[in-house]
From Swiss-Prot:
Localization (cell): Mitochondrion inner membrane
Claim: Cell membrane is one of the keywords in the record: no
Keywords: Membrane, Mitochondrion, Mitochondrion inner membrane, Oxidoreductase, Transmembrane, Transmembrane helix
Pfam families: COX7a (PF02238)
Protein known as: Cytochrome c oxidase subunit 7A1, mitochondrial
Source lineage: Eukaryota, Metazoa, Chordata, Craniata, Vertebrata
Pathway participation: Energy metabolism; oxidative phosphorylation
SUPFAM superfamilies given in the database record: Mitochondrial cytochrome c oxidase subunit VIIa (SSF81419)
Role played: Component of the mitochondrial respiratory complex IV (CIV, also named cytochrome c oxidase complex), the last enzyme in the mitochondrial electron transport chain which drives oxidative phosphorylation. The CIV complex is the component of the respiratory chain that catalyzes the reduction of oxygen to water. Acts as an assembly factor that specifically drives the homodimerization of CIV complexes, mediating the formation of mitochondrial respiratory supercomplexes (respirasomes) containing two CIV: supercomplxes with two molecules of CIV show improved activity.
InterPro entries tied to this protein: COX7a, Cyt_c_oxidase_su7a_sf
Membrane topology qualifier: Single-pass membrane protein
Organism: Canis lupus familiaris (Dog)
Assembly behavior: Component of the complex IV (CIV, cytochrome c oxidase), a multisubunit enzyme composed of 14 subunits. The complex is composed of a catalytic core of 3 subunits MT-CO1, MT-CO2 and MT-CO3, encoded in the mitochondrial DNA, and 11 supernumerary subunits COX4I1 (or COX4I2), COX5A, COX5B, COX6A2 (or COX6A1), COX6B1 (or COX6B2), COX6C, COX7A1 (or COX7A2), COX7B, COX7C, COX8B and NDUFA4, which are encoded in the nuclear genome.
Family of this protein: Belongs to the cytochrome c oxidase VIIa family.
Gene Ontology MF annotations: oxidoreductase activity
Amino acid sequence: FENKVAEKQKLFQADNGLPVXLK
């Protein structure tokens, strides 16, 4: 569970200005 949360947080951080969710 923690691993998935960390991954989602990383995705959010990467989405600082790039459409990672769309990638």
